[in-house]
Amino acid sequence: MQHDGVMSHPTLGEPVRYLADGGAPEREADHSLAGFRLARRLGADGWEVTGHRSADDVVVLARNPTVGWRRRSRSAIPAADSEAPPLADLLAIDADQAPLVSIAVAARETLDAVILAAAGAGATGRMWIRCGDLEVLAAAAADLGPTRPMLIHEAPLAAMAKGPERHASQLRAVGVDGQAMAFGQWTGGLTALFHRFDRLCVGRSATHVRMIKEFVEMGVDSASSLNPERLDEARGKLP
């Protein structure tokens, strides 16, 4: 298929998801409920967020793992004492429309807490969990079985020591559902390769409309941006 003379590649099957990174941080506070709601009004299909486990085992949403000038770890602060909203509050936004949530975690404990929160909200099927530790993801896939959120490995090409084809094969072998990389890493050839192994291709950090369009033409299964209005503008310029 071609868009304006440019060869485009298909997604794995579902339409591409346009995700607002942190809500609408150019207009509202980053990772705020106001920003998440605004992103939906601006046309985002869901959100890309970062989750942390609080001292009382609640998943809270914030880009940074520490808070304040003393750089206290969010894991040492109860959720009620944190300015970061809980994941449960995000999952309640437009719940009847099932917006996708792609959440980054750093450890298995946080991953398990995300799964509990998603299950409690009836949102397991619209949750993608990203993690840079493939061993954590592989263990979770083995432990949790098929009724779980999608598990996405987040790492650059340079981390694929044996090359992308071997890496995609490994993801399939251990039951990890996809790969996340930033703009500048994905190509149409790479999305086709990962799709050949039935792995999702998650595109991150597209700053401009042009970049979002390129992501879609490459065949990524989701594209994220800090600017949700640009996501909607890019969608409007594509067939």
Regions found by a protein language model. Give the residues of each.
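Phosphate-group recognition and catalysis centered on beta-loop-alpha active-site segments
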Residues: M1-P239
